[in-house]
Amino acid sequence: MTTEPTPITPLRILLLDDDPFMLSLLADMLEDLGQLNVRSESDARAALKTLPHFRPDLLICDLSMPEMDGIEFLRLAAESHFGGSVILLSGMDAGILKAAETLASAQGLTIIGACKKPVPPSMLADLLLQAAAQRTA
């Protein structure tokens, strides 16, 4: 017997990753979890321009990107009063993820997860539930 993914009330989700494969993988995983209001950006500067118009409930952000890394992007998102939840993603070690989580939290952002890539679908589903709870809190 297979279990179908439990649909979650769709959130507005902004994906930010410079890797097209990772963006596609995450978008597919989110769609499988019932998340249909997803926008993807491969450039942090473009994502900053998207924030005020799209107003995502959740931002899923890679840390290691060219031009502007995830930490700088998150600092600027915090300065622009981004009020949604954040999931940090990285291929780097756990210490880097923890440091990034601490820095982003210090900027006033709500970090609900810091995950090593690729994030397992079950973990992503749990984090989406947390983001939905934050949205209604």
Question: Model-derived features: where do they sit?
Answer:
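Active-site beta3 strand of CheY-like receiver
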Residues: 54-60, 86-87
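Non-catalytic signal-transmission and effector/linker regions of two-component phosphorelay proteins
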Residues: 1-14, 27, 110, 120-137
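Receiver (REC) domain active-site loop signature in two-component systems and cognate sites
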Residues: 65
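Two-component/phosphorelay signaling modules centered on CheY-like receiver
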Residues: 20-39
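Active-site residues of response regulator receiver
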Residues: 17, 62
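Alpha4 helix (beta4-alpha4-beta5 surface) of REC/receiver domains from two-component response regulators
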Residues: 72-76, 92-114
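Acidic catalytic/metal-coordinating carboxylates
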Residues: 42-43, 69-75
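Short hydrophobic/Thr-rich beta-strand motif most characteristic of the beta2 strand and flanking loop
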Residues: 35-42, 50, 115
